[in-house]
């Protein structure tokens, strides 16, 4: 029998995927949400290279993306075939749901309600509501979502964030609010006079 645990600490084979990665909340390393600024693919994997990583949505932990090539183990008999390598990596924070600590790098601050999901450079709030809620945004950037007299979300946009970039929709009893991340850093175009020399 071969030892399923690699000397480097990785685990191999499907039967070992039940092992949970250690909780990353005790990690002292701080990480911003820009760690995956290129967004996630359909597997909830970060597109950013070279340190791509996946997210285990069930346990809300980051997992290291498996390499493109298989790992060949020093095994005999039926174990001689290459088997995929998956490195367990707890990551610096839960994902894709963000904590208040991670919110400081986003264009919105949550005061009451659910934390957003960040994907493809967009901050998204998914709010469950039996009826169509009312969504208001003041000129100061305060966001309020209410339904049947109950406040579902209270948030505020960061200073100088363009309010017109916020988009909201309601379908299947879920209100979705989308806030692009990069809009906070883009300034409005300013006309520059052109001098034509003769």
From Swiss-Prot:
Pfam families: DUF5450. Residues 1-36 are annotated as: Disordered. InterPro entries: DUF5450 (IPR035226). It comes from the Eukaryota. This protein is found only in group 3 isolates. This is Protein C4. It comes from Giardia intestinalis (Giardia lamblia).
């Amino acid at each position: 029998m071969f030892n399923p645990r690699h000397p480097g600490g990785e685990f191999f084979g499907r039967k070992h995927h039940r092992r949970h990665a250690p909780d990353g909340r005790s990690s002292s390393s701080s990480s911003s949400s820009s760690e995956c600024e290129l967004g996630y693919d359909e597997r909830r994997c970060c597109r950013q290279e070279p340190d791509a990583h996946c997210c285990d949505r069930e346990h809300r932990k980051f997992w290291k993306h498996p390499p493109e090539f298989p790992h060949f183990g020093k095994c005999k008999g039926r174990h001689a075939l290459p088997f995929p390598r998956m490195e367990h990596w707890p990551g610096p924070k839960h994902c894709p749901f963000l904590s208040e600590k991670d919110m400081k790098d986003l264009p919105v601050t949550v005061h009451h309600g659910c934390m957003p999901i960040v994907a493809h450079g967009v901050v998204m709030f998914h709010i469950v509501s039996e009826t169509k809620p009312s969504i208001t945004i003041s000129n100061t950037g305060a966001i309020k979502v209410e339904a049947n007299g109950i406040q579902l979300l209270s948030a505020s946009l960061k200073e100088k964030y363009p309010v017109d970039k916020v988009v909201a929709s309601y379908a299947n009893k879920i209100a979705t609010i989308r806030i692009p991340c990069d809009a906070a850093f883009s300034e409005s175009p300013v006309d520059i006079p052109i001098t034509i020399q003769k």
